[in-house]
């Protein structure tokens, strides 16, 4: 049996972090190993928790979005990165900045779990369900 994917949740809102943790705690192949509410804490948390994947709110306080992704890619290039946003227009910018995937926060939990699975298999999933 494979080890579960170790996930860090990065969102400035406690309610969103709680919802994501609740969802991921139900998945047998995923383990939430950390949470952050500000960009300045993210790289250290990824490294101390040995994270495989980050769920990153596009509006995470503390650093401009593209600069944060660039810093993550420089410090933790092997870590998968899924950007979450309630604004579908952020998709292109997130993917161009280096995210492995983008998920609109209005998508279903099943969809988010499928994107996590794709990302963990190192298949870049760059299509937003709503855009064909």
Model-predicted regions and their roles:
Residues 47-49, 71-78, 97:
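Conserved phosphotransfer cores of two-component systems
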Residues 55-72:
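Conserved phosphotransfer microenvironments
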Residues 3-16, 20-24, 54:
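Conserved acidic segment of CheY-like receiver
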Residues 67, 87-103, 114:
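Alpha4 helix (beta4-alpha4-beta5 surface) of REC/receiver domains from two-component response regulators
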Residues 117-132:
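The C-terminal output helix
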Residues 82-84:
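Hydrophobic/aromatic residues positioned on beta-strands within the core alpha/beta folds
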Residues 107-120:
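C-terminal output helix
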């Amino acid at each position: 049996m494979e080890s579960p994917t170790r996930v860090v949740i990065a969102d400035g809102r406690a309610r969103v972090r709680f919802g994501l943790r609740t969802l991921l705690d139900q998945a047998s192949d995923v383990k939430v190993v950390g949470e952050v509410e500000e960009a300045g804490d993210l790289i250290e948390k990824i490294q101390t928790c040995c994270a495989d994947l980050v769920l990153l709110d596009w509006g995470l306080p503390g650093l401009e979005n593209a600069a944060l992704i660039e810093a993550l890619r420089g410090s933790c290039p092997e870590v998968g990165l899924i950007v979450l946003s309630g604004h579908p227009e952020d998709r292109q910018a997130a993917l161009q900045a280096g995210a492995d995937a983008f998920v609109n926060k209005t998508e279903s939990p099943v969809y988010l779990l499928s994107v996590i699975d794709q990302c963990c298999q190192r298949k870049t999933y760059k299509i937003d369900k709503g855009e064909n």
